Amino acid sequence: MKMDTGYDKMNIIFRIFCVYDEPSADLCLHKDLHLSNVHHLAVKRDGVQSIQIEQESACSIIYREETAGMLHIIFHIDVNSAYLSWTAVEQLKNGADVDIRTIPAIIGGDRESRHGIVLAKSPSAKKFGIRTGEPVVNAFRKCPNLHMDPPNHRMYREYSRRLMDFLKTYTPEIEQVSVDECYMDFTGIAQRFSSPVEAAYEIKARVYEKFGFTVNVGISTNKLLAKMASDFEKPNRVHTLFPEEVKEKMWPLPVSELFMAGKSSVAILEKLEIRTIGELAKTDPKLLEFHLKSHGRTLWEFANGIGDAKVQSEETAAKGVGNSTTLPKDVEKAEDAKKVLFSLAESVGKRLRKAGQKANMVSVEIRYSDFQNVSHQKQLGRASGADQVIYEAACSLFDELWNGKPIRLLGVRTAKLVDEDEPEQLSLFDLQFEVKSEKPKKSMEKLKKLSAAMGEIRGKYGADAVIRGSVLEQREKEKKYEKKQF
């Protein structure tokens, strides 16, 4: 089905629920679209409809109307080689003769010892085959005359703050996901511009004019596709990746370029002879779930362009409870990371109970040693404030997210909070078990009582009065590491 790409004419959005001959995706219809190629249209209950399209081998598509009115348009704004760009701008302000963005240059490590990893690189350095995340010593082997500056994270945070403050002059609907990237919900300000592309070019130009560094802007109907679009050709570019462009622009890419497709997942996919995003999109999701568990379904949805369109601004994010920690030493083993996650889950659970609240959603954040941030979230089966429930959800998310790289920071956050005494809506699955046995219900009650009791003991006698064996073991490791350092 051919569709006009004039998104200012968009009136109705439909989400495909089931496709018999083609993979599931978002389908966008315009108010002036002529349905001359629709073979059959049948209205069913709850607004669910079924159509057959002659041009697509009469494949059946079941969809539901999602929104009437303006389509959600999301921008992903990403600073090009942020650490190097910000360092270059600061050096030029202080009278430097050379712009390090124009020469082979990197940010990372110690200049004298040449230890550490490459955190950012210039386009010229990239031509020598230098990659972000590789050891600095390797970079110097590839380019002996390489210029290197150490990182200055205080300066990066200041430039990041200035950028976010500027973007908020357009709209407060900004979700910052790392020091150098954010999502913007363009929907509320669409009437001020002739098109999203025009707005993106204006933002990009004004950022350069005001600050002296460049950004890429990706545009789509959800955060996933906007993120993928901004990662296309760099620097200083605007790219679109609307649902009808996925097949042409995204499917030919290697599966390793799909968001959240880590090394271990890619290795499994390649064993299944799935090498492109398009091949992944056309694979039976049940097969992917068999090999990659729930992460397989997530990757299948991403390959088909299905993602979240909700931008979580600071105001929205504040309606949650979370905790994160920067680790004294990069963590390289999953078992060590999960001990940290347990400690964080305990902290979050304690704060929830103190506030008399339960959470319906848990999210996990990972920051790697190269300062790349990734995060993901999941709905709980029922609202909970129990440490163990939060911990198990966090571990599940961690297993989906972690790509094997050394970890510098871990965070656990809960959202969609409700009052602790709010009645619980049990699922059919829960009811089945409670009819046969009271064990699941009793188990949940025990978890709540245990968490509350531990919290009470710590409140009276201090945080270390009750410590899980796994947490104690992790602390002993950290103490040994600190002794070695001094």
Over which residues does each language-model region extend?
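Alpha-helix boundary/capping motif
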Residues: 5-9, 21-23, 27, 31
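Gly/Gly-Pro- and Ser/Thr-rich, intrinsically disordered tail segments characteristic of DNA damage-repair
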Residues: 16, 34, 52, 56-301, ...
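DNA-contacting surface of Y-family translesion DNA polymerases
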Residues: 64-69, 257, 265-407, 422
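C-terminal hydrophobic structural anchor segments
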Residues: 396-449
